[in-house]
Amino acid sequence: MNTNDNRLKAHKLIDHIFQDLLPAHGMAQRPEQIQLSHRMLDAMQDGRIALCDAGTGIGKTYAYLAAATAASAFPTGQIARPIIISTSSIALQNAVLMEYLPLLSCILMADGILTKPLKAVIRKGKSHYVCDERLDRRLRQVNLGKKNPEALAALRTLKETLDMDRVSHLSGYDRERVCVPQVCDCKQRDCRYQRFLKTCDKDQFLFQICNHNLLVADAIHRSEGKRPIFPEHSIIIVDEAHKLPETAQQMLGVTLAAEEIRNLILHLKEERYLLAAEMLEDSTGPLLRKLAQPREEAEPVEACLRLLTAPSCTLPIIQRQIGSLLSPLGSRQLNTVLDAVKLFTSSQTDMIFYTAEDVSTGGAMLCAAAGDITQRIKKILWQPD
C-alpha cells in the first residue's frame, strides 16, 4: 500500500463526487461542501480530531459520507471497520440509512468506483429490541378475549420484527415486558437479538449508525473494561455534536425520572406487595406531582430535593423487608431508585445537582453530574487509554 498515492486518490475521489457525479444527478456544486469534505478526510487519514462547523445548506452529511467512503476505499493506514456515525435525532439516522447512502452508493456503482452498495445498520439500545423468550411468555400470559385487537396484533408482529420501533400500536406496557432486559444472559442459539449482535460484530457493515447515548455508553464500557457495544473502529463521525455534552452529562451522571418511580410502584403491585406499593406511592406523591409540572429555569433544584425526604426513609424499609423476595427485574428497579435517592439526599461536594426536561413526559427530572464532567468526557471519548 502506497500511503501517499492513496491519500491523493482519496482526495481526487472527493473532487470527482462533488464536481462531477452529484451535479450530474441535479445537485449543485458547493465549494464550501468540497472544502469541508477534504478537511474531514485529512482528519480521518491522520487519525486526528477535527471540529467542523457546517452552516445550514452546506451539505455536511454528504461531506462526511464521501470523506469516510474515500478513506475506506483508499486507506493510508489500518482502517478498522465499521465507521461509527453518531447523531442526536432518529430522523437523521433514518435519512442517512434510507436516503443519503443509497444515492451515494448508486452513483458510485454506476461510475464503476464501487462493485456493491455501501452497507449500514442502525444500532440502538437493548430496550428497542424484542426478547424472544419474554415475547413467548407475554403471549402465553395475555388474555386474548380482553386484549385490544391492535395491541395484540402488534405483539404477534414482533415474532417477525426484531426492532420494536418499527411496529405500530405496541403499548408501552407490552414494550416493557418483551424488550431485551438490561442484564441479558440468553444462551438460545436461535435468539434473534444475539444473532443480530453477531452480525454487527462481523465485517459486514461499513457504517454503523447510532445516537449519542449509545456512543457514550460504548466509551464508558471500554473505560471500565466491560464488553464494548461496537466492534473495534478507527473513525467516529459525530453529527449534531453540539448535543453531545448534554448527553454525556446525563450518561456519566445519575437521573431520577417520575417514570422510574411509577414503574417500581407498578411492579410492586404486580408482585402482590401491595403494602410496599402503597407506602412508596404515599411517600413519593408530592415528588411525582412536582416532576409532572413543566420545568422552570429559575426554580432552584432544592425545591425537588426537599421532596425526597420521605422516599429516603421508605425505600430502605422496603429494601430490608422484601428486597430479597423480589424478582430480578423488581430488585433491579428498587436498587436503581434507592441508589438515586441516596445520591440526591447525600452531601457529596463533587456532584452537581440540577433539573432537566423529561422529554417523554414534558415534566422535569432530577439529574446529578460529576463536577469534572469535561475531563471525564475527554478521557473516555477523545483520549482513551
Where are these regions (language model features)?
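Short loop/turn elements that form and flank the Walker-type P-loop nucleotide-binding site
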Residues: 45-46, 79-80, 202-205, 230-232, ...
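Hydrophobic positions in the central parallel beta-sheet of the AAA+
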Residues: 50-52, 85, 208, 236
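Walker A/P-loop
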Residues: 46-67
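A substrate-engagement module of RecA-like helicase motors
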Residues: 2-23, 28-31, 75-208, 212-213, ...
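Walker A/P-loop NTP-binding motif
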Residues: 41-42, 61-78, 99-103
